[in-house]
Structures are given as C-alpha cells and as structure tokens.
Amino acid sequence: MISKKDISFIQPSRNNLKYLKWSYDSIRKNGGSEPTICVADDFSNDGTWEWCEDMMKKDPNFKAIRNEGPKRLGHTILYDELVEIADTPIVGIY
C-alpha cells in the first residue's frame, strides 16, 4: 500500500512566488504534511529563494535548491535535479 510518505512533488520556478505559495498550500491542504515538496529556484528576483529558505526551516518535508545564475538553467535541467533530491519512490510533477 502506498503511503503519503512515499510521494514527492517537484516544481521548478522562476519569479513565480505567488504560484509557489498557492501550490504549497494546495499540496498541504490535500495531502497533509507527509508528502515531500521539492522546489528549484532558477535565479528568481521576486523573493522566491527567501521564501524557500523560510519554508525549509518551518517544514521538515520541504526541500529547495537554487541556481545562483546569472544564466537560467531552464525547467528541463531543473526537473532532472529535483528528481535527484526527491527521496521517495513516487515523484509527481507539479
């Protein structure tokens, strides 16, 4: 049987803090605190990384990585990196 602890949601982002907050709230509302949420920030300048740092302190099932730039990596590369940090057998793209 699959448990919520077996699931990670991965989400790359660039300057999309409003959507990240919405998706975080949606996952937590519907899945509780057990699924892991993994975010990759692609050199944002809208406060995304600061929010991610704060969430990593508050939520033990939240992980984030950051592209320090200045060149963007893009979603494809970031999805690959997110799959690497997701430590569950099931990974959902969000």
Which residues fall in each region the model found?
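Short aromatic/hydrophobic "clamp" motif used to bind/position activated sugar donors
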Residues: 91
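A conserved acidic beta->alpha catalytic loop
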Residues: 41-50
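Glycine-rich, basic loop-to-helix element that forms the pyrophosphate-binding segment
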Residues: 68-86
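Catalytic metal- and UDP-sugar-binding loop of GT-A-like glycosyltransferases, i.e.
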Residues: 94
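Conserved donor nucleotide-binding strand/loop of the catalytic core
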Residues: 53-73
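Short, acidic, metal-binding catalytic loop of nucleotide-sugar glycosyltransferases
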Residues: 25-34
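N-proximal low-complexity "stem/linker" segments adjacent to membrane-targeting elements
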Residues: 1-26
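A structural signal for isolated positions on well-ordered beta-strands in alpha/beta enzyme cores
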Residues: 8-10, 36-38, 63
